[in-house]
Amino acid sequence: MKRYIMLLTLGLCFVAPMLSQAVDIRPIIHVTNVHNGQYDEELDAITATKFYGPYQFRVLKDSVETKGETKDIDGRAFRTSDGVFMHVKARSIDNTSISLDKEIEKIVKDRTIPEPTVKMVLPIKYDVTEVDNDGVRSLLAEFMYSWPLHNRTDMVLVTDYEDTRYYYKLQFYRDQLPNGVRIEQLRKMIMDAQFSYK
């Protein structure tokens, strides 16, 4: 009997840390994409450069700029015939604003814990990547949804620059990508957002 109790205790010791990790929604951050003004021929072939103030970002070449898709639309929004949605907006940062890291944690929490009044829609995967383009720090939160939003991926790139926080949202369905465009290229496209010094 003592042997069974000891085995049960050891089992609980191994399982408890795994359970705590399963409910922990703190994003794992890793650094990538140091831009340093590098020319990307492959990205230039499928994207066009747009501006929102000093914010320089890429959209797919065949996309059309749209307005009024949602009641609270602001910034610039683009959509392709394949349903790829690209939306850039900005807001001022003041003393009451949370940090960039806290902002991303809030986005992750909002996306991974649904409201109790709506149908449960949980991502099957999320990840947070730290992006450094010419010394300007951005954080990219990526969400891959399961049922009922199966095959949908959202990416949200958040950047602080000169007292302004910029958001770039990219939304697409993995089974409806434009011809010849890969998910890796879309990820690279959104992470390439930088600032014009002109």
Residue ranges and their predicted role:
Residues 1-4:
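Positively charged n-region of N-terminal signal peptides that target proteins for export
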Residues 7-16:
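Bacterial N-terminal signal peptides
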Residues 19-85, 149-151, 169-198:
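N-terminal targeting sequences that direct proteins away from the cytosol to non-cytosolic compartments
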Residues 21-38, 97-120:
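Short N-terminal secondary-structure initiator segments
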Residues 74-106:
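A short acidic-to-branched-hydrophobic micro-motif
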Residues 92-94, 145-147, 174-176:
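Beta-strand elements of well-folded, non-transmembrane domains
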Residues 163-168:
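Short hydrophobic/glycine-rich mini-motifs in sensory/regulatory modules
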